[in-house]
């Protein structure tokens, strides 16, 4: 058991530098076969899903959230202050026009349907 824990820890220490490497710009990502290149971190993000909103809040990126939607409950206690001024497009599915009207540089959606 001790050997397994030691190997696991050694593996983590080996890959940790890559996991925490700084992002370089421009950054190209591919999603669903479509490539998108960002020359800088997106400053206007719309989240379609509470999970995505919580991730951005946990990363300290609340100022980048232009608007949010699709909420299922209250924010976890550690995120309440960061999320208190968020603009909600809808508690459920927002319209395409509502999302596009925010002029987002990035839309994060929890389901492919959105």
PLM feature spans:
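Bacterial Sec-exported substrate-binding components of ABC uptake systems
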Residues: 2-7, 12, 19-53
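Alpha-helical transmembrane segments and their juxtamembrane interfaces
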Residues: 14-15, 74
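A short, structured surface patch at a secondary-structure boundary
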Residues: 44-113
């Amino acid at each position: 058991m001790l050997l397994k824990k030691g190997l696991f820890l050694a593996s983590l220490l080996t890959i940790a530098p890559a996991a925490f490497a700084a992002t370089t710009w421009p950054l190209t990502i591919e999603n669903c076969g479509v490539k998108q290149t960002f020359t800088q971190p997106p400053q206007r993000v719309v989240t379609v899903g509470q999970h995505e909103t919580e991730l951005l809040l946990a990363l300290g990126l609340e100022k980048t959230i232009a608007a949010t939607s699709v909420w299922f409950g209250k924010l976890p206690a550690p995120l309440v202050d960061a999320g208190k001024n968020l603009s909600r497009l809808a508690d459920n599915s927002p319209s395409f026009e509502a999302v596009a009207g925010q002029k987002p540089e990035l839309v994060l959606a929890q389901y492919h349907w959105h």
